[in-house]
């Protein structure tokens, strides 16, 4: 159990660092969203969070107390921090487009960056009744039918009340339908943990994932290059992309975690600085997500030089990583101070701190 939690923390730590790197590219430097590294980062980090959430959710009974805990952890800071962000943004010197008011933000598709906590809570709400149905299904095929039917309902609802192109989505249904499959995949990975272990340790499955990943990624981020594919095919390609990402990520990070955190000659483990760094980021991933926007700063003078050299992967990744490291450090410091106040910790970090 301990090792599993540690490799999940490593995965979350790497993923949240990629989140900040992506925002450095799109909000600090700006104007270079066509860079491949941005498109890559934008597709690989969030599936990890939703998979882990689904995996850890399977053991929950989802009675009212569990939902109350999720509400306090996710929805309270969603409303408070997003409102503060809308107020603060005009003073940030960032030039990225953002909603003019809090009501506009709540009606937008991406919620000005704060969509994740709302989407995750909505997934818990959907899973609550679905879990009761799954418990009553005696066979795997019956469970899959229930999951596919739920997915179809979410897709239909999203088609009626959500539009990324029009930047409209009051209830968050669009992103809910995007990430429902990988969340449920996490649930099934926990339920059938022995089979999941075989998948992540199998060279065959890793090869399949490595082949599917670039193909699915290409159809999602460069749809204009595959005009022969109907738009609706994304309801299949996106889940395939997310599952491929998770298989590759777990297959890579789990052995690393075992090496880093395994006891040495009967003594306590001595993980490297890198492993300890990403593990710590993983334990503070929600705090980093909620607060890091406030510490982004303009880097627009870098736009033209980077465009002039063709937006190369390595220099852009290096710049984004260095800036992200600084932003994460400041964010963690502020989160530590906020965490000393139980009220502020709840409102701004989603943490319930006992006095």
Segments predicted by a language model, with ranges:
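Membrane-interface helix-boundary motifs at transmembrane edges
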Residues: 4-5, 61-69, 130-142, 190-203, ...
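Transmembrane alpha-helical segments
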Residues: 53-60, 122-130, 181-193, 238-257, ...
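Hydrophobic residues within membrane-embedded alpha-helical segments of Major Facilitator Superfamily
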Residues: 18, 48-50, 189, 212, ...
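Interfacial loop-to-helix transition and helix-capping segments at the boundaries
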Residues: 34-46, 104-119, 160-182, 218-245
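Aromatic-anchored segments of alpha-helical transmembrane domains
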Residues: 17-24, 81-87, 148-162, 208-223, ...
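Alpha-helical transmembrane segments and terminal signal-anchor/GPI-anchor hydrophobic tails
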Residues: 197-279, 302, 310-316, 320
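Membrane-cytosol interface segments of multi-pass membrane proteins
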Residues: 1-153, 307-355
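Juxtamembrane "helix-exit" motif on the non-cytosolic side of transmembrane helices
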Residues: 25-30, 90-95, 157-166, 217-228, ...
């Amino acid at each position: 159990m301990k090792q599993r939690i540690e490799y999940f923390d490593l995965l979350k730590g790497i993923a949240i660092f990629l989140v900040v790197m992506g925002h450095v590219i799109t909000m600090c430097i700006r104007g270079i969203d066509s860079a491949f590294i941005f498109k890559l980062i934008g597709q690989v980090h969030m599936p990890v969070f939703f998979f882990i959430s689904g995996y850890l959710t399977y053991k929950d009974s989802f009675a009212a107390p569990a939902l109350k805990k999720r509400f306090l952890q996710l929805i309270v800071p969603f409303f408070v921090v997003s409102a503060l962000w809308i107020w603060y943004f005009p003073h940030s010197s960032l030039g990225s487009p953002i909603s003019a008011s809090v009501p506009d933000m709540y009606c937008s598709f991406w919620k000005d960056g704060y969509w994740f906590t709302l989407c995750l809570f909505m997934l818990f709400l959907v899973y609550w009744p679905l879990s009761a149905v799954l418990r009553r299904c005696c066979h795997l095929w019956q469970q899959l039918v229930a999951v596919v039917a739920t997915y179809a309902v979410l897709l239909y609802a999203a088609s009626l009340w959500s539009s990324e192109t029009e930047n409209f989505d009051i209830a968050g249904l669009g992103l809910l339908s995007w990430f429902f499959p990988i969340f449920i995949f996490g649930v099934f990975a926990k339920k059938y943990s022995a089979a999941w272990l075989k998948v992540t340790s199998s060279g065959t499955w890793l090869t399949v994932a490595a082949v599917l990943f670039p193909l699915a990624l290409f159809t999602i981020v460069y749809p204009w290059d595959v005009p022969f594919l109907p738009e609706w095919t994304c309801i299949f390609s996106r889940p395939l992309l997310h599952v491929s990402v998770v298989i590759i990520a777990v297959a890579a990070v789990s052995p690393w975690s075992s090496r880093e955190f395994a006891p040495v000659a009967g003594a306590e483990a001595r993980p490297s600085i890198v492993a300890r760094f990403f593990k710590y980021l993983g334990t503070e991933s929600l705090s980093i997500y909620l607060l890091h926007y406030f510490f982004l700063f303009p880097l627009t003078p870098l736009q033209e030089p980077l465009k002039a050299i063709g937006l190369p992967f390595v220099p852009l990744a290096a710049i984004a990583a260095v800036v992200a490291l600084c932003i994460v450090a400041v964010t963690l410091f502020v989160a530590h101070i906020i965490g000393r106040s139980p009220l502020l910790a709840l409102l701004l970090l989603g943490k319930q701190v006992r006095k």
